[in-house]
């Protein structure tokens, strides 16, 4: 969709950018402060700080900009420690992006504009939001400012005009051809990868593709037998719960004919095609056993268990953990189950609903997996009871659950949507999601009332909605794709775990004396955090040095240890949604490349 250029807005933005660049060149803190609104926020994605960081408030933002992005000229607030190499120059509206426009963000009107600039080492992009009304003196002030690295000068992605020529294998008829070279590259018979990516899901593929395009030698290892099996092996009816336009992988978008909600097997097959098309190095049936870091050499010694049972040691400089927000199954000790005579499995082990046709199944846990498994079992003829342990947020998959992705339906390029998504600082993201949570509750008022009447406990304590539940705990919500309706209609039973006194050989004994029969109990009890996996694979010392992974660091206003250096050199993490991994894989890859070429020690 083409958006007409509003020349008045463009003039406002151009004047602000010129004043901003001039104030930084002069290291003039007073002039900078005049450009910022009292409620201002600056988020930097490597462009000026080589970090992912957010700063809020006029004086903190001024101080940070002077520290990282000011020139060395004398001026009001001149900072002798300023780094002229990071000073933005050539700040102009990016004519290749969505033109400046008036929009609503976090419930407030603003002027939103994409711009581009350079530093000594980087080409970069930015997103500016100005309050729509001019302040005293007629100058518009910045509400939010995003600065984000795009590419390292001299080390650009090998795409387009920089694509490989192919001469080495197309004109040397007696030498190895393309396939020979690919096989040798994947084998690592005589060298180690620069980067080892652990996990071949969307997170691992995203970072490996980014690094491949930066000419960084990267190997993905995954314990599954086939690329995509992390999706292919899940329960039969699974589809993605957000829409196709949000879920593209880097460089290779899904075809325009694909369904809105992608089936698991279709996605799994796409993963295989993606690896082949982008020439990603991938070892299947390979388990990452653990790793030790050598501070003297700056390399890891990682142990891999191969398909034939043998071990292989590799020595990469970087290990990227791409095993997901949820890694190790959380199997709680439930004493009441000790006397149960039937089968018990964790939701991660659940595969085949048809095997339980006509039989009684109890699913413990009311998050997404619990609901989906209950619905899958019911659809295949099982008699299902869902057991709730704690209050759960429920939203209809359409339209309420899709509200956080509304920007991807504004008719603008995915790249622009990604920049907008990355530009909201934590405070405004919370405000935005609080408003969306209220809107979703209004949309789903009837569903919530019906579930409450059936005895389902709705989580109303968290006012920021499902996405902040994901960012803080990785779950605790359900997108209703039909199971809630089955509960309301009485087709799927509902019990509270607190009402279960004990289990016997036949099922659950309730405190009131009733019996709920069960041949199978599925524990949809979630997963342990990545901290547990780090401790298991790398040991206590490295886990302690690394620190907590995932969840929000309130002081920094960022996710903890995601997409950026951790306390352990050479250990990185990437996780989250398809959109998060598409967006932040770029910045993780740039940080690794900058270290490889010596821009960062």
Language model regions located:
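N-terminal Rossmann-like FAD-binding beta1-loop-alpha1 element of flavoenzymes
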Residues: 187-220, 369-378
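Short, low-complexity N-terminal intrinsically disordered segments enriched in polar/charged residues
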Residues: 1-38, 182-193
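N-terminal Rossmann-like dinucleotide/flavin-binding domain of flavoprotein oxidoreductases
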Residues: 58-73, 90-118, 240-307, 473-493
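Short beta-strand edge/turn micro-motifs at domain boundaries
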Residues: 2, 114-183
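A solvent-exposed, acidic/Ser-Thr-rich amphipathic alpha-helical stretch
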Residues: 12, 22, 26-79, 83-107
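Flavin (primarily FAD) cofactor-binding/catalytic cores of flavoenzymes
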Residues: 148, 160, 216, 221-223, ...
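Glycine-rich active-site loop/strand segments that organize a redox cofactor
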Residues: 232-269, 391-455
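A short, basic/flexible loop-to-alpha-helix module at the beginning of a structural domain
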Residues: 168-193, 345-357
């Amino acid at each position: 969709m083409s958006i007409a250029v509003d020349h008045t807005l463009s003039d406002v933005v151009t004047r602000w950018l010129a004043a901003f660049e001039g104030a930084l060149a002069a290291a003039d803190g007073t002039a900078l402060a005049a450009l910022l609104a009292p409620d201002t926020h600056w988020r930097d994605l490597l462009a000026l700080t080589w970090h992912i960081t957010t700063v809020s408030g006029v004086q903190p933002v001024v101080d940070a900009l002077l520290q990282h992005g000011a020139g060395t000229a004398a001026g009001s607030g001149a900072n002798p420690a300023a780094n002229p190499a990071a000073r933005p120059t050539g700040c102009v509206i990016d004519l290749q992006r969505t033109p400046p426009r008036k929009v609503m963000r976090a419930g407030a009107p603003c002027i939103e504009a994409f711009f581009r600039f350079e530093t000594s080492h980087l080409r970069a992009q930015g997103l500016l939001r100005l309050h729509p009304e001019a302040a005293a003196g007629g100058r518009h002030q910045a509400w939010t400012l995003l600065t984000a690295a795009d590419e390292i000068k001299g080390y650009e992605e090998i795409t387009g005009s920089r694509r490989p020529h192919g001469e080495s294998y197309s004109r040397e008829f007696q030498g190895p051809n393309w396939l020979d070279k690919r096989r040798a590259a994947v084998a690592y018979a005589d060298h180690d990868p620069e980067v080892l990516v652990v996990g071949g899901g969307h997170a691992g593929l995203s970072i490996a593709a980014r690094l491949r395009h930066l000419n960084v030698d990267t190997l993905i290892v995954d314990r599954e037998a086939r690329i995509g099996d992390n999706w292919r092996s899940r329960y039969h009816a699974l589809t993605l719960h957000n829409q196709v336009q949000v879920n593209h992988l880097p460089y290779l978008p899904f075809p325009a004919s694909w369904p809105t909600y992608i089936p698991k097997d279709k996605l799994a097959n796409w993963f295989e095609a993606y690896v082949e098309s982008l020439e990603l190095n991938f070892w299947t049936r390979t388990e990452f056993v653990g790793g030790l870091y050598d501070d003297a050499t700056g390399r890891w010694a990682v142990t891999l268990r191969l398909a034939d049972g043998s071990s292989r040691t590799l020595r990469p400089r970087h290990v990227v953990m791409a095993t997901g927000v949820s890694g190790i199954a959380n199997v709680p000790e439930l004493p009441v189950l000790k006397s149960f005579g039937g089968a018990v499995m964790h939701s991660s082990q659940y595969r085949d609903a048809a095997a339980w046709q006509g039989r009684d199944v109890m699913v413990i846990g009311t998050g997404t997996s619990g609901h989906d498994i209950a619905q899958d079992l019911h659809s295949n003829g099982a008699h299902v009871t869902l057991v709730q342990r704690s209050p759960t947020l429920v939203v209809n998959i359409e339209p309420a659950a899709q509200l956080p992705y509304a920007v991807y339906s504004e008719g603008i390029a995915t790249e622009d949507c990604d920049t907008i998504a990355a530009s909201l600082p934590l405070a405004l993201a919370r405000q935005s999601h609080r408003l969306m949570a209220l809107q979703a509750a209004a949309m789903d008022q009837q569903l919530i009332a019906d579930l409450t009447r059936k005895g389902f406990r709705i989580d109303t304590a968290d006012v920021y909605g499902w996405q902040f539940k994901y960012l803080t705990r990785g779950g605790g919500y359900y997108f209703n794709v039909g199971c809630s309706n089955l509960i309301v209609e009485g087709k799927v039973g509902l019990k509270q775990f607190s009402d279960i006194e004990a289990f016997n050989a036949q099922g659950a004994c309730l405190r009131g004396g009733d019996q709920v029969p069960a041949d199978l109990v599925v524990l949809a009890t979630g997963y342990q955090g990545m901290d547990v996996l780090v401790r298991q694979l790398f040991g206590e010392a490295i886990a302690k040095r690394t620190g907590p992974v995932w969840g929000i660091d309130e002081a920094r206003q960022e996710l903890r240890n995601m997409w950026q250096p951790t306390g352990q050199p050479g250990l990185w993490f990437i996780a989250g949604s398809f959109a998060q991994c598409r967006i932040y894989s770029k910045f993780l890859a740039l940080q690794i490349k900058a270290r490889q070429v010596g821009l960062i020690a």
